């Protein structure tokens, strides 16, 4: 059973009769859902589907008629984290801080009317140098989160949170292990897919300058046949002003972060 809400969180009704539901969580980006059910007037774009403490916004509705004369709807959308896809970084943003604080600052400084708040920091460590102009807010924080192995989420309470998942693999002993097996009767079948079509592991990042004077750094050290190269134009990472110049070392660090973000987005894709 799912509750449907208006964009202002006014409850509109319940969905109890549906044919199928896929509710897909994502760690470092917005999750998505797909719902197939008989059509009703609650299923319109921008309405919100609540599933416990999680919620998603309806972004697509496809209506079809059946041979039996019924009307079915395929409803798709993304979790409320996707609201951040509606904003860009408005101007220049340059910070040297933890990945957590940088993501929180990107969101806080670019809400511009979005009905979201930002949770207090949890103190995750690891400082990075970051600079961007006019990037998409969701794309930027997703890249930082993936590079830093952090999760991002916006629940039904419309609070943006940065979190870190628990390692439940068999190779560790700190947390209870999660084991899926037919022997435990907690899985009926399985599917594994690996995709390397867009995979890159070495990136040449270009900063300020022209020709032989352009600032260039390389991120990644693969060699031979395993080496997969790409280029990123990072001219938006500047050298500051005459009054407040950015050191060459800091520019290199910012370019390195941009390269790490790129490689995080282009890593080998595995799904289970």
What spans do the regions from the language model cover?
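A residue-level signal for beta-strand positions that form part of recognition/binding surfaces
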Residues: 1, 32, 55, 72-74, ...
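Short beta-strand-centered interaction patches in the first periplasmic/extracellular domains
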Residues: 63-84, 120-200
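Surface-exposed cap/loop segments at beta↔alpha junctions
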Residues: 37-122
């Amino acid at each position: 059973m799912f509750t449907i809400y208006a964009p202002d969180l006014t409850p509109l009704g319940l969905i109890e009769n549906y044919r199928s539901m896929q509710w897909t969580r994502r760690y470092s980006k917005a999750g998505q859902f797909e719902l197939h059910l008989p059509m009703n007037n609650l299923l319109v774009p921008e309405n919100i589907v609540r599933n416990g403490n999680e919620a998603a916004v309806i972004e697509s509705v496809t209506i079809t008629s059946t041979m039996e004369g019924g009307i079915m709807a395929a409803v798709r959308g993304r979790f409320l984290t996707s609201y951040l896809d509606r904003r860009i970084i408005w101007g220049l943003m340059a910070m040297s801080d933890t990945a957590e604080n940088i993501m929180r600052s990107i969101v806080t400084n670019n809400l511009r009317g979005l009905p979201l708040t930002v949770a207090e920091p949890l103190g995750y460590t690891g400082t990075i140098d970051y600079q961007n102009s006019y990037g998409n807010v969701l794309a930027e924080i997703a890249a930082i989160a993936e590079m830093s192995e952090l999760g991002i989420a916006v629940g039904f309470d419309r609070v943006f949170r940065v979190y870190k998942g628990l390692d439940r693999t068999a190779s560790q002993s700190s947390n209870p292990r999660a084991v899926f097996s037919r022997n435990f009767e907690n899985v009926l079948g399985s599917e594994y897919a690996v995709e390397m079509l867009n995979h890159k592991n070495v990136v040449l990042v270009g900063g300020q300058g022209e020709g032989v004077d352009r600032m260039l750094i390389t991120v990644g050290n693969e060699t031979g046949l395993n080496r997969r190269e790409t280029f990123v134009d990072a001219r938006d990472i500047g050298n500051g002003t005459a009054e407040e110049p950015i050191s060459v070392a800091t520019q290199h660090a910012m370019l390195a972060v941009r390269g790490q973000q790129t490689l995080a987005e282009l890593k080998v894709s595995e799904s289970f």
